[in-house]
Curated annotation (Swiss-Prot):
Upper classification of the organism: Bacteria, Pseudomonadati, Thermodesulfobacteriota, Desulfuromonadia, Geobacterales
Homology family: Belongs to the Fmt family.
Protein name: Methionyl-tRNA formyltransferase
One function term, GO molecular function aspect: methionyl-tRNA formyltransferase activity
Keywords recorded for this protein, A-Z: Protein biosynthesis, Transferase
Length: 312
């Protein structure tokens, strides 16, 4: 079976590697253009491109996959199936209609929950205790196609998006392999999604990481977990950004956003109905440190206020 693989970030690499290991006929990989990334804004290739080139697979990097010339070049490759994992562009109907076996997407949630761009983040932010991967037939909607196979995993109450990302990328590769086996055996069963059960995982922005201390401790912890490592959570102390990487829930009382303890255990901040202890942080212009180490050299008084940059 002639397969085109479409994907871009690290999350997609285990699935491509699985296709390679299975000796599937991957005739091309389509990924996003090389783009500036990281602190130095160095132009770097997508991880999927690097993996494809290591195995001698032809790579295409269209700025827009929907333009007619690109669609035509894909048609000329005569794929039987297109596999899509975190590609980053919407596929037009003209492209979806090309392969006789359709386009199968590996989506990092238990559909119909968390359709959209950032399911890994939102399932943690919302406090879900279980998530997984769904393989689905793609249609013109946003993650609305028929479901094929699901694999579930529990979410540890202390894990962040990075560890969940790494685990689901492997689960996704296994799910795709099982889906292909069912397809080859003629046993693939399609299941319609129930739109009434859906919710959307919208793309996150840096400003979404500003901590609202008027929330309850569990919600604050879930935000920190769900936004780590990107886009990150933060607050402000005396007008300086304070990045927050890890917290634990406590039972202190005080005005939300007020520092109610600072010591070797961390920086305790009042929320509504309790408190959190910041265990790892980074003040603007300083190194990322365990909070106890940071507080050994930088005094923050009990009663100090955390909040918006312009907060008094």
């Amino acid at each position: 079976m002639r397969i085109i693989f479409m994907g871009t970030p690290e999350f997609a690499c285990p699935t491509l590697q699985k296709l390679i290991d299975r000796k599937e006929e991957v005739v091309a990989v389509i990924t996003q253009p090389d783009r500036p990334r990281g602190r130095g804004q160095q132009t770097l290739p997508p991880p999927v491109k690097v993996l494809a080139e290591q195995h001698g697979i032809p790579v295409m990097q269209p700025v827009k996959v929907r333009v007619p010339e690109v669609v035509e070049s894909i048609r000329e490759l005569a794929p039987d199936l297109i596999v899509v994992v975190a590609f980053g562009q919407i596929l037009p109907k003209s492209l979806l209609d090309i392969p006789p076996y359709g386009c199968i997407n590996v989506h990092a949630s238990l559909l119909p929950r968390w359709r959209g761009a950032a399911p890994l983040n939102w399932c943690i932010i919302d406090g879900d205790t279980e998530t997984g991967v769904t393989t689905m037939m793609m249609d013109v909607g946003l993650d609305t196609g028929d479901m094929l196979l699901k694999k579930t995993t529990s979410i540890d109450p202390d894990e962040n998006t990075q560890s969940l990302h790494d685990r689901l990328s492997i689960i996704g590769a296994d799910a795709l392999a099982e889906t292909l086996d069912l397809l080859n055996a003629g046993k693939l069963v399609r299941e319609k999604q129930d739109d009434a059960l859906t919710c959307y995982a919208s793309m996150l922005k840096k400003e979404d990481g500003l901590i609202d201390w008027s929330r309850d401790p569990r919600s604050v912890k879930n935000l920190v977990r769900g936004m780590t490592p990107w886009p990150g959570t933060y607050t402000f102390l005396d007008g300086k950004m304070l990045k927050v990487y890890r917290v634990r829930i406590a039972e202190g009382e005080g005005e939300p956003g007020t520092v109610i303890g600072a010591g070797r255990q961390g920086l305790e901040v009042a929320c509504t109905g309790g408190s959190v202890i910041i265990e790892e942080l980074q003040l603007e212009g300083k190194k990322r440190l365990p909070a106890g180490d940071f507080l050994a050299g930088y005094k923050i008084a009990t009663g100090a206020k955390l909040g918006h940059k312009d907060a008094a």
